[in-house]
Amino acid sequence: MATIQSETDCYDIIEVLGKGTFGEVAKGWRRSTGEMVAIKILKNDAYRSRIIKNELKLLRCMRGLDPEEAHVIRFLEFFHDALKFYLVFELLEQNLFEFQKENNFAPLPARHIRTVTLQVLRALARLKELAIIHADLKPENIMLVDQTRCPFRVKVIDFGSASIFSEVRYVKEPYIQSRFYRAPEILLGLPFCEKVDVWSLGCVMAELHLGWPLYPGNNEYDQVRYICETQGLPKPHLLHAARKAHHFFKRNPHPDAANPWQLKSSADYLAETKVRPLERRKYMLKSLDQIETVNGGGAASRLTFPDREALAEHADLKSMVELIKRMLTWESHERISRDKNAGHSNPPRSDKGPAPDKTLRPDPELFDSGSCPGEWLSEPEWTLEGVRGPRAQGLAPRHSHPHGPSRTTSFLQHVGGHH
């Protein structure tokens, strides 16, 4: 068993949890406290030094946050030797992708998606106070803390791709966000802000219900095509301003058309790039409203005598879809706001760790208006059963999951680049 030592502590390496292209994550025992920790280990070279420097800057900016209240991973320390860099974090249980995979990608009930959503929105609100854009929100970067003791309590992890907004706002074509969760303004080359994280969270919410990514594009053209086929084309003024519009759209040859732009066809894209567009969607939705009908959604409305649980799940699902629609908008200014007062209530804590979030309440100012989505998150009854997985509803994937047979441990995702 290897041992590594910082200036103030000593860690016994128990096992390697995951490996990536440039490093690994290990489970370690912290001798000073007797707690298990996660240690991200990277080679000590100039390239990784730049990566580490950015992540450390962000983690130090977050020092003032309460990790339990803000739902972000607790950072313990950084140290290095001649060969390796070491970042030490609290040890969490598993990420949402691993949880989905463990449960055969069965749909998660809307009440549990609500629990997760509120906590991540709170994390984003706290990050906004620090002018931080996470820029890589996805199921792998949302971790379950302790599913047995605190079901569906989560924390946001991996700030290796995060940025201070003032430092990146003028970057013309930032390469941020994993493709499935990449916001339209990044795809099209438009000005962006922290609302890119809201788009990503909307995609994650849909994926937790569908058991499959909403927009699993093989490349940026497929990504834009999928969004257009479900949500329609962006408004003309967006495409006029978009630096990358010509990558995906062309001028409409009909001068009287309502939209002077049209999406390039798959044949157009193949002729231009020699890359054949692929179909990787499990559900080819014609609108976001159709999310509600997938995996038994709306079943309660078809029953003659639905029980209370079925009716509650149906109402939850309808409200969830309304919220997703407010998060997945072409224009970022139309997305829900992450107000600075969002979710100010502190969850209960004890010496044994965080207690279940039975007292979690969102602040009404989280949203721009008191519409249905806000009411959905304000529901006072939080169902927190001690179960490890969602009810086994829905179909297993019909073909290989678009994320591939395995994804490296979350901490390492940013090191290998975005897909």
Identify the meaning behind each predicted range.
Residues 349-419:
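Intrinsically disordered, low-complexity regulatory tails and linkers that flank structured modules
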Residues 36, 41-69:
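Conserved N-lobe beta3->alphaC-helix segment of eukaryotic protein kinase catalytic domains
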Residues 128-146:
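Catalytic-loop of the protein kinase fold
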Residues 24:
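Conserved N-lobe ATP-binding subsite of Hanks-type protein kinase domains
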Residues 197:
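Conserved catalytic-loop aspartate of Hanks-type protein kinases
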Residues 81-90, 97-98:
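A conserved loop-to-beta-strand element in the N-lobe of protein kinase catalytic cores
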Residues 236-323:
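C-terminal lobe substrate-recognition/regulatory segment of protein kinase catalytic domains
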Residues 116-117:
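Activation segment signature within eukaryotic-like protein kinase domains
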